[in-house]
């Protein structure tokens, strides 16, 4: 199906940090970056997810104000424009997930490690931080910046829901998740009130082989 699936070339691999999985951000890497390493940042993903590309934090500022941060892995720190790895990623276009394997867009050292917001690891990111009214969802302030984070926890959806539902869990992570959950409900209600189109997505897509009019076999959903 013309999906690029060959091993990464030596030229591409030479673009990776020489420290490998022992890479740590240097002081120079952190200049001009907002520091969110002390915030209660967590990620929520499907079970088995290794390429954690986004994480969240939600802090109570008092007076019905929340600070909400969305942090996205800063892949551009490792992939320079026009480099061999940049050209290879452009050629591949996306990571392809098959039933029995995945075909990475970039080498696993980046996708599953250095550009994955793994809990307990310092990671470079892009952040959008809002100050929001916790009762109305009104946004008071928005700030974008390059940043550095250190996630507190890499949770599955079920693990996050368990923390939200457990009344005995009054830890920082659980309270942050509850604030995010409450705010999400407010924002969703506002979107629906304004006429948002809500589409249900199927949990599973099945492909069926059929015979076309040209007698060639085709795959259809």
Predicted regions span which residues?
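Structured, non-catalytic alpha/beta "coupling" segments that mediate domain-domain communication
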Residues: 1-11
């Amino acid at each position: 199906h013309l999906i690029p699936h060959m091993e990464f070339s030596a030229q591409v691999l030479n673009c990776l940090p020489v420290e490998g999985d022992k890479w740590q951000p240097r002081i120079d890497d952190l200049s001009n970056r907002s520091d969110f390493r002390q915030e209660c940042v967590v990620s929520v993903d499907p079970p088995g997810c290794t390429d954690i590309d986004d994480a969240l934090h939600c802090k109570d500022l008092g007076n019905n104000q929340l600070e909400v941060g969305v942090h996205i892995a800063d892949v551009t720190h490792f992939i320079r424009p026009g480099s061999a790895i940049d050209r290879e990623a452009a050629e591949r276009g996306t990571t392809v997930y098959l039933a029995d394997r995945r075909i990475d867009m970039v080498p696993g050292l980046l996708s599953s490690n250095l550009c994955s917001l793994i809990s307990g690891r310092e990671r470079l990111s892009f952040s959008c931080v809002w100050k929001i009214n916790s009762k109305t969802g009104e946004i008071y302030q928005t700030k974008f910046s390059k940043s550095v984070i250190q996630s507190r926890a890499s949770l599955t959806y079920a693990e996050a829901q368990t923390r939200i539902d457990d009344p005995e869990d009054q830890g920082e992570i659980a309270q942050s998740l509850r604030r995010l959950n409450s705010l999400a409900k407010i924002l969703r209600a506002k979107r629906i009130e304004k006429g948002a189109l809500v589409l249900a997505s199927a949990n599973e897509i099945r492909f069926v082989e059929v015979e076309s009019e040209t007698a060639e076999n085709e795959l259809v959903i």
